[in-house]
Amino acid sequence: MDSLNGKAGKTMIDSHGRKIDYMRISITDRCNLRCQYCMPEELPSIGHTEILRFEEILEICRHAVSLGITKFKVTGGEPLVRKGCLSFLRSLKTMPGVEQVTITTNGVLLKSCLSQLEDIGIDGINISLDTLNPEIYEKMTRRNEFSQVWDAIVATQASKKRTKINCVLLKGINDHEFFDLIHLARDYQLDVRFIEIMPIGYGKGFEGFDKKDLLEKIAEKYPDYQVE
């Protein structure tokens, strides 16, 4: 990082000359799913006394704003399982200097929280969904929660809230659904993002696809689609 100025209104610039204006915040390591490429069925959680309190996270965010950060992406684990998440989002959204707050969720608890997220003024919702097949979903996540996630996606459409779907394609597991997920983007006016699996930790046992291969597949079948 070549430039770092702590004065309010200044910005951070990386070594490629790009402005750094967003921060990703993981507010919990806990999750109500057990995706095979992410975490095991049994995983000890970090104790509440060992993680940052929301007040401490907000203090970090205030300092980040003074360095030019205006956008915050809240993730986990599954952020909605942490008690007080919605109050935290409200405080972050109303913090002076903050222009955008989005949340990434697996969608299991989303429908019940959607009206509150709208009231908070959340700027975007990213939903992690790797398959449209309930049986494959249960196999991948070790949980039978597909209907709750799908209902949440439908609910976001009714609310007109900006929604994106994050999908990890794995060879031999859900890769045959590639174009079904493309059609989901078309039919529901959603942004679908295919994320490369990280070959670390529990992801080492799975084979994914690289970005170039996926872009070529889309461009070949749908030359008029906008892909990036």
Language model segments and positions:
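Canonical Radical SAM [4Fe-4S] cluster-binding loop centered on the CxxxCxxC motif
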Residues: S15-F54, L67
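A C-terminal junction/extension of Radical SAM enzymes
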Residues: D187, D191-E228
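Residue-level signature of catalytic and energy-coupling elements of molecular machines
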Residues: I27, L117, V192
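Flexible, acidic/Gly-rich N-terminal and inter-domain linker regions that tether
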Residues: M1-R24, R30-R34, A219-Q226
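Short, small-residue-enriched loops and turns at beta-alpha junctions
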Residues: I27, I46, E78-R82, L170-I173, ...
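Radical SAM/AdoMet-radical enzyme domain recognition
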Residues: I51-V74, V81-Q189
